[in-house]
Amino acid sequence: MGFWCRMSENQEQEEVITVRVQDPRVQNEGSWNSYVDYKIFLHTNSKAFTAKTSCVRRRYREFVWLRKQLQRNAGLVPVPELPGKSTFFGTSDEFIEKRRQGLQHFLEKVLQSVVLLSDSQLHLFLQSQLSVPEIEACVQGRSTMTVSDAILRYAMSNCGWAQEERQSSSHLAKGDQPKSCCFLPRSGRRSSPSPPPSEEKDHLEVWAPVVDSEVPSLESPTLPPLSSPLCCDFGRPKEGTSTLQSVRRAVGGDHAVPLDPGQLETVLEK
């Protein structure tokens, strides 16, 4: 997980940027055009960003496009390297985990550069689910939306919230933590317990809701409050999507997705 602080010019507020690349998934599994995409979660109080919290899914091919655009606009400023395209690490799940780590390292370095951070294409890549042609049209003024409009429209969307809430409730019922970093509870309240049968008829008894003593938060207390729930699982088509819940290997708290050896040749180059 990427996390760093930077003092603003007036030294009054510490800028915090948290970025995570995680939850690799195989899209269109079983077809000739299957590929792996990754969840990118970003939370910040930096004024450079339109939305303070965002969550999108991007594939490796889109990272390659982003780096080319950043290099074109950055001039002599060096752009971080991406993980290799055809390097094998023994097993498929190990390869995907190495790639995930490489993509996160790439974004961490990019977001530390003031020059690269000023590129509008980077912001649309991180904070909207626009495709590559749509991003190019937006920054070139060939779209009906401005860059800020596209980011805010995506940030205000609550699509997939009900499904994410149900899944999280199911995990919590089993004593687990929510798996999606984008699930943000609307409040710290749980359902109020029902009164014991012996006291159900006592109308003078008041049952107050139970409030969690610990509210989920990110690493830094300086981060601004999250105003609206976000879920990035709706950015990709639902058809042919596999969450691959079986046998995931945890490395540093993130999860790598195992692939069958037969799938590796069609997936790794995408």
From Swiss-Prot:
Q: Choose any GO biological process term that the UniProt entry carries and state it.
A: intracellular protein transport
Superkingdom of the organism of origin: Eukaryota
Q: Which Gene3D superfamilies match?
A: Phox-like domain
In the record, which residues are listed under signal peptide? none
| Ranges of compositional bias, category Basic and acidic residues | 168-177
**Domain PX: start-end pairs:** 16-132
| CDD domains per record | PX_SNX10
- Single GO term (MF): phosphatidylinositol phosphate binding
Q: Which residues bind a 1,2-diacyl-sn-glycero-3-phospho-(1D-myo-inositol-3-phosphate)?
A: R59, K85, R99
A single Pfam family it belongs to is PX
Subunit details for this protein?
A: Monomer. Interacts with TRPV3; this interaction promotes TRPV3 trafficking from the cell membrane to lysosome for degradation.
Q: What name has this protein been given in UniProt? A: Sorting nexin-11
Source organism (scientific name) = Homo sapiens
